[in-house]
Amino acid sequence: MKKIEAIIKPFKLDEVKEALQDVGVQGLSVVEVKGFGRQKGHTELYRGAEYVVDFLPKVKIEVVLADDHVDAAIEAIIGAAKTDKIGDGKIFVSPVEQAIRIRTGESGDDA
């Protein structure tokens, strides 16, 4: 099993969720996060004063999948989240040793 963590622009969340559902993903977790990458921050003007915004709002999606579903999920995320502009986000894939469904005690791919 693998865990996919995708950091995306918030307005792309619905499109990414639908794209993942289309490739068979049955569940995911979403967390609102702030961060910066190469794009750094930006300046905003508010009531005549200029402010530097260092951390930009993003959304982190977490999905745990069987190994044979990972490539399709990654392609779905990229296809739905890509705007061809700086700040589109990143995808991280890491191994998951074990998953257990609390209610039933099922483990592995059944969890």
Residue ranges and their predicted role:
Residues 1-111:
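Positively charged, small/polar-rich N-terminal and surface patches that mediate targeting and assembly
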